[in-house]
């Protein structure tokens, strides 16, 4: 299968080379965590001398005998080489029960530069501070961006054609090996179902999967809608899936912990405060939505909004839903001193739609940049200080 260099992630790990932290690569199942680790190992071999690489892949039967934390610890210590820079890489670390005891002990010795990956459901961002006593840095990996999709399919097709494909195929690159749409969607659906019906059920000892499945399908079908556990529980109960807001709230948290969804909270622009009531949930990848729902309710405005949200997170922004009086700004994004207000739409060719998207932005009185991202199929242009971007071209930017 073809591979590409995911330069953004590789550069980030290279920046952390030699720092006194445990480097933890996280992300949804099949997002490319192991491939990234392998690419970094190749980089080290090509660019450094006098190094010792200790690599353990718990998916490989060769390491079956050290799937016990004492044995893992002893194996690493036995392979340490004095006088060299010792790198420790452990892939699928969760397959060794109590792995954190071995990793913490090895970290405390100060002899190893440590990198680990694990299943999304068993190496959760929320758990890291509890698992590891030392400093750690999380490198979060998303499915392929549109830019990476174009890099993978480096051929004569134009950006518009590739964008239409990416809207339904998404960024789970393992699906690209299959020639038919049926096989591709089956692959994506199996990744999704493994997380929802196996990983999370096992992680949290859930009594059954029905409520979790229905909840996940509901959120998938309602991306970009303001949602609360109370509202969702009422709708699920009305559709014969009896539950309550407490269970729904917990299950939403589990789905977000596993990076299936990302929760985006609201921000009152005028009052400059964060709002606790209602939030939006965005799916980690557009391909999952198509694999689960097909063309049913294929609302491109919502799909594009989801794609923009994930891309903003991928680019390192803090993302919020903006509230201004009774109007909504799709995204208020911040990174350091940078702030941008963003509206997302499908088609803004009609004057009515264009004015509707512009109106909330024009009411904002500060001087931060404002933009509309839509399927314009035109180069970037401006209106009343608002930048108008074609979504395919915007996604191709750095």
Predicted features by range, described:
Residues 4-18:
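Pre-Walker A adenine-sensing motif
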Residues 25:
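Hydrophobic anchor at the beta1->P-loop junction of P-loop NTPases
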Residues 33:
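Conserved lysine of the Walker
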Residues 36, 40:
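Hydrophobic positions on the alpha1 helix immediately C-terminal to the Walker A/P-loop
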Residues 54-84:
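Short glycine-rich substrate-engagement loop in P-loop NTPases that contacts/grips substrate
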Residues 119-121, 126-226, 259-262:
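Interdomain motor-coupling "hinge/lid" segment immediately C-terminal to the ATP-binding subdomain
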Residues 181-339:
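Accessory nucleic acid-recognition modules appended to NTPase machines
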Residues 377-398:
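Domain-level recognition of nuclease-like catalytic cores that cleave nucleotide substrates
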């Amino acid at each position: 299968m073809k591979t590409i260099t995911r330069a953004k992630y590789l550069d980030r790990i290279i920046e952390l080379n030699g720092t006194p932290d445990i480097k933890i690569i996280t992300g949804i199942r099949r997002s490319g965590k192991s491939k990234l680790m392998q690419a970094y190992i190749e980089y080290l071999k090509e660019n450094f001398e006098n190094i010792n690489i200790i690599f353990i892949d718990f998916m490989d039967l060769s390491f079956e005998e050290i799937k016990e934390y004492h044995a893992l610890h002893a194996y690493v210590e036995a392979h340490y080489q004095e006088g060299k820079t010792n790198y420790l890489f452990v892939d699928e670390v969760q397959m060794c029960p109590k792995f954190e005891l071995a990793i913490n002990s090895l970290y405390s010795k100060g002899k190893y530069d440590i990198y680990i990956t694990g299943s999304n459901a068993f190496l959760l961002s929320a758990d890291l501070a509890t698992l590891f006593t030392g400093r750690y840095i999380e490198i979060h990996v998303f499915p392929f961006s549109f830019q990476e999709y174009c890099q993978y399919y480096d051929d004569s097709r134009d950006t518009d054609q590739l964008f239409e494909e990416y809207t339904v195929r998404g960024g789970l690159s393992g699906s690209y090996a299959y020639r038919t749409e049926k096989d591709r969607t089956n692959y994506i659906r199996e990744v999704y179902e493994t997380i929802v019906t196996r990983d999370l059920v096992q992680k949290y000892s859930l009594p059954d999967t029905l409520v979790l499945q229905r909840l996940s399908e509901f959120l998938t079908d309602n991306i970009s809608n303001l949602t609360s556990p109370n509202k969702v529980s009422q709708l699920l109960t009305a559709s014969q899936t009896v539950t309550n807001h407490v269970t729904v709230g917990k299950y939403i948290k589990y789905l977000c912990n596993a990076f299936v969804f990302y929760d985006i909270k609201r921000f009152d622009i005028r009052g400059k405060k964060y709002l606790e009531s209602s939030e939006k949930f965005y799916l980690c990848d557009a391909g999952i939505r198509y694999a689960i729902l097909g063309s049913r309710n294929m609302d491109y405005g919502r799909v594009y909004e989801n794609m923009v949200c994930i891309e903003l997170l991928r680019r390192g922004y803090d993302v919020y839903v903006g509230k201004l009086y009774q109007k909504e700004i799709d995204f208020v994004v911040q990174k350091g001193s940078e702030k941008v207000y963003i509206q997302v739409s499908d088609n803004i060719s009609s004057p009515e739609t264009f004015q509707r998207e512009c109106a909330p932005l024009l009411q904002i009185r500060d001087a931060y940049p404002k933009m509309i991202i839509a399927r314009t199929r035109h180069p970037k242009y401006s209106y009343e200080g608002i930048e108008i971007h074609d979504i395919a071209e915007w996604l191709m930017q750095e």
